[in-house]
């Protein structure tokens, strides 16, 4: 290859191996084909596994057990359950339309809201920094840290308890608004990696994907 400038750096992706780091081989019967993964789990789930489990500069291990585990723990549990719970409560309590009421609750609840918003609005720059260093797996991990924080927020605010108290309806609306806004920002960050999944999420939330430059703003 002809270069006009001195060759300074070469980025090389690690190898994809089977169980226990053993090289994939047809003779060993441990080859996993992308077409089979797509047929069983879909394009986005396959893309997620490959991007998340193939860390930069290191070899990545892929087995059917690992694929299923990652699908269940991350996509179904952390993300899927979060979206389903939020959409279900929004539909049940507010006919799917939630707006900010500014009801922050007591001092503890105010601090919880502030922490959620800090995590959410700070994720964009973390993702950008990881991507600048070609750390795709780490960038995806940052997005899922946002979703994990949202799940924790549900446990901290107990919207199902708020729903039983007529005096707490504004607070309930604020909690669900914060969740909807947070998930929308998370989905917008996820769109570069899992486009179909991100679009389905905002469709369920009745929101739209945001531009990257706006993902450090809440509300």
Where are these regions (language model features)?
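Short, charged/polar, low-complexity loop and linker segments
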Residues: 59-64, 121-129
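Basic, alpha-helical terminal appendages of large translation-related enzymes
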Residues: 60, 129, 133-135, 144-219
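Beta-strand segments within the central parallel beta-sheet cores of soluble alpha/beta enzyme folds
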Residues: 6-12, 202-204
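Secondary-structure capping and boundary motifs in well-ordered enzyme cores
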Residues: 3, 26, 37-39, 67-78, ...
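Short, hydrophobic, well-ordered secondary-structure elements
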Residues: 76, 80-90, 140, 144-147, ...
């Amino acid at each position: 290859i002809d270069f006009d400038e001195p060759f300074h750096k070469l980025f090389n992706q690690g190898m994809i191996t089977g169980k226990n780091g053993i090289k994939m081989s047809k003779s060993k019967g441990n080859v996993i084909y992308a077409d089979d993964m797509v047929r069983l789990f879909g394009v986005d789930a396959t893309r997620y596994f490959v991007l998340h489990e193939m860390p930069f500069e290191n070899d990545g291990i892929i087995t059917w057990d690992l694929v299923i585990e990652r699908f269940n723990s991350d996509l179904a549990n952390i993300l899927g359950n979060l979206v389903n719970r939020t959409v279900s409560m929004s539909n049940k309590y507010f006919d799917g339309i939630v707006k900010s009421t500014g009801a922050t609750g007591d001092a503890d609840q105010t601090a919880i809201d502030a922490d959620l918003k800090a995590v959410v609005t700070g994720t964009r720059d973390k993702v950008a920094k990881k991507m600048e260093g070609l750390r795709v797996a780490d960038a995806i991990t940052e997005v899922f840290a946002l979703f994990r924080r949202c799940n924790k927020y549900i446990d901290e605010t107990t919207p199902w308890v708020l729903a039983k108290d007529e005096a707490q309806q504004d607070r309930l609306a604020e909690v669900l608004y914060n969740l909807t806004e947070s998930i929308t920002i998370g989905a917008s960050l996820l769109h570069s990696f899992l486009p179909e999944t991100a679009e389905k999420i905002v469709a369920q939330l009745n929101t739209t994907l945001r531009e990257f430059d706006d993902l450090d703003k809440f509300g």
